[in-house]
């Protein structure tokens, strides 16, 4: 009874303390000596009836309840392993050694599986916790408020300065009119002395040109005459009288006038073309006289001066 009590007390000590290194070596030596036992399907039993694997990331959210069963697994392994603290391996009988060896062989791989699963689960939980802490520690910096961005954009690109620059360039363009006539006091640059034409616009989805010239041509059927002359003319000769059929300077003047006279019998509106053309020239002259800001003098001297200094002198003289 005494050795059994000692053995029982020794096994109870194993639950609290892990075995020493020399005891493990002796156990490995005994396992190597004993023949490997073949187990039947009835003797093989599962440790747990259900696994703890989940498909979702809920495992990381529950680290606290998992620590308790892992400690119980390690304690079970320490309880099952039979270790003699008194080191009395030589006094054991052969039958007892065989029984213990068989039990060790039967439970050895199961214990190794349980310890491996426990270590894998613990390492997985530790790695997940460490990765989560690393991600939390390396979180990106907070984004600035959109209001601050707009203030920065306004500081770097002020719109007021750009508008001032544009106004300054426009003022410089207005002060470029420096060639003033001595008689009328008006500018003599090419832009100011260019003749002004009557206004025109595009109609019918920008396909038809609405102008005074086109109204005269379509109203007097001159467009039909131009089309006939265009198809009858020879382009190799270079005589484009189809654009101006009433001109006297181009070739075949008599034949053109005879053809237009014959067409006027069927199209009497062609007779209205000469007076309509005269009225158009008169309207152009009046419009140009009113809207042209430059000088109209034929023979006059040009004075180079600034517009601001010569404006007062120009206003005093008659135009």
Swiss-Prot record:
InterPro entries: Sprouty, Sprouty_domain. The modification N-acetylmethionine is found at residue 1. Residues 112-131 have a biased composition (Low complexity). Residues 54-160 are annotated as: Disordered. One of its GO terms (biological process) is negative regulation of ERK1 and ERK2 cascade. Signal peptide: none annotated. It is a peripheral membrane protein. This is Protein sprouty homolog 1.
